[in-house]
Regions:
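Regulatory N- and C-terminal appendages and interdomain linkers associated
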Residues: 1-49, 188-189, 197
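Conserved ATP-binding subdomain of kinase catalytic cores across diverse folds
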Residues: 31-138, 163, 167
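Generic detector of well-ordered alpha-helical packing
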Residues: 69, 134, 175, 193-195
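Short gly/pro-enriched beta-turn/loop segments at secondary-structure junctions
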Residues: 125-127, 159, 173-175
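AlphaC helix of the protein kinase catalytic domain
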Residues: 140-148
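Conserved alphaE helix
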Residues: 150-161
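Catalytic-loop of the protein kinase fold
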Residues: 167-177
Length: 200
């Protein structure tokens, strides 16, 4: 998971908003970074990893990333499917999730390393994206338990891992069998921290 360098936080203004990024991953950033077509390889994900069809796998020939565009759910999506009310930079969905991931990553918890996030503002609304490093060779818990023989200690280890997140005060707004990912060594990872928070 590319833990060779300390995660940094840089904020750079753009024409319509800002980008927050780790400059040990991306030395230079622009809005083009969040366009799948600007990458050497990009592939839209299947729905099995969760989300609303808003995730792309990106590959620059060296490292692999995941790009998520923020979409609304529920009834409100009928009126505004990817725009959110502007309440300030620090309250954007993308910046909040990026910083929450950084907090968890810095505590050596099993989460994807945040690479970059952005927002683009238009009057009282904004749109947003986030890029994280891809966790190698994982599958959703839902798929794992349907296809694999479950090791005897698997559920205990999973419970212990989730407890570690609670010990640091994490509230995950959508913890389900798709946002828990299992790698080849049966280690569990948590993803999708949109609307998550740290609570005392």
């Amino acid at each position: 998971m590319y833990k060779d360098k300390v995660l940094t936080e840089i904020v750079q203004n753009t024409e319509l908003g800002s980008i927050i990024f780790d400059n040990t991953i991306f030395e230079e950033v622009s809005q083009e970074l969040f366009s799948p077509s600007s990458w050497l390889h990009s592939k839209k994900s299947s729905n099995e990893i969760g989300g609303r069809g808003n995730v792309y796998f990106l590959n620059d020939g060296d490292k692999k990333y995941v790009l998520k565009h923020y979409f609304r759910g529920g009834l409100v999506s009928k009126f505004s499917y990817d725009s959110y009310l502007w309440l300030g930079e620090n309250k954007t969905r993308s910046f909040r999730e990026w910083r929450l991931l950084k907090f968890l990553y810095d505590k050596n918890l099993p989460v994807p390393r945040p690479a970059a996030a952005n927002y683009q503002k238009n009057n009282y609304l904004y749109k947003a994206d986030i890029i994280t490093q891809q966790i190698p060779e994982v599958q959703p818990l839902a798929t794992f338990i349907a296809e694999k023989t479950i090791p005897n200690n698997f559920w205990c280890k999973l419970g212990y891992q989730i407890a570690n997140f609670h010990f640091v005060g994490l509230f995950h707004a959508d913890l389900n069998a798709f946002n828990i990912q299992i790698d080849k060594s049966h280690k569990s990872w948590l993803i999708d921290f949109d609307k998550g928070s740290i609570r005392e």
